[in-house]
Amino acid sequence: HDDYKKYHHAIVWGGGNVAMDCARSLVRIIDDVKVVYRRSEEEMPANKVEIRDARKEGVVFNFLENIKESLRDENGQVVGAKVVKMELGEPDESGRRSTHEVADSEYVEKADLIVMAIGQKVNFKPLHDSLEKKEGHVSSLENVYIMGDAYTGPATIGSAVLEGKALAKEIVQSFEE
C-alpha cells in the first residue's frame, strides 16, 4: 500500500504467523524490516516455512530480544525502539520457556514504523457458553455466525480473509433460500 512507502525502517514485534504475514508484506515495500522476538527461533510459534520464506525475502530476525518502549521525536513520530536482550529460563505453566531480561543490555534500534503483532489470548468462554456451533458457521442464535479465531482457534490473517469470503457466500445463500 502506498501509505507505507514513506517508511524506511520497520520493526515487527512478535513471533507468530501474523508477525510473519506483516513482515513479509512490509519487506516488499520497505528495505529494512526486522522481526523482534523475545524467545529463540526454536520457540518461535510461526510456521517454519513462513520463517524461511521471510528470511529469503530479506526480513532480518532479532531473536532473544524484546521491545521496552517506542521512541518518538518532538513531533510524536516514531524514530526507534528501546530494545533489551533476553535469556531463556525454565518452562512456565504452559510449557514454554520463560524469558528474562539480560542486565545492562538495552540498545536503540532505528525504526520509523513499529508493528505490534504479539499474541493475545481472547476469552471466548462467555461466547461459547451461549452459542452452539451448528452446520458451517451458523450458530444456535438466529443471524449470529461464528468465524475467525472463535471458529478455528488462532490462525493466520490469510486464512481469516478466506474464511470471511466463504462466510459471506454462506450468508448470501441463506437469504436466497
Regions found by a protein language model. Give the residues of each.
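Rossmann-like dinucleotide/flavin-binding elements
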Residues: H1-K48, Y107, L113, A117-E132, ...
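Conserved beta-strand-loop-beta-strand element in the redox core of flavoprotein oxidoreductases
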Residues: R72-E106
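A broad structural signal for short, well-ordered beta-strand segments within beta-sheet-rich domains
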Residues: Y7, I67, G76-V78
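A conserved beta-strand/loop element that lines the FAD pocket in flavoprotein oxidoreductases
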Residues: G58-I67
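A structural signal for short hydrophobic beta-strand segments in well-ordered beta-sheet cores
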Residues: I67-S70, H137-V138
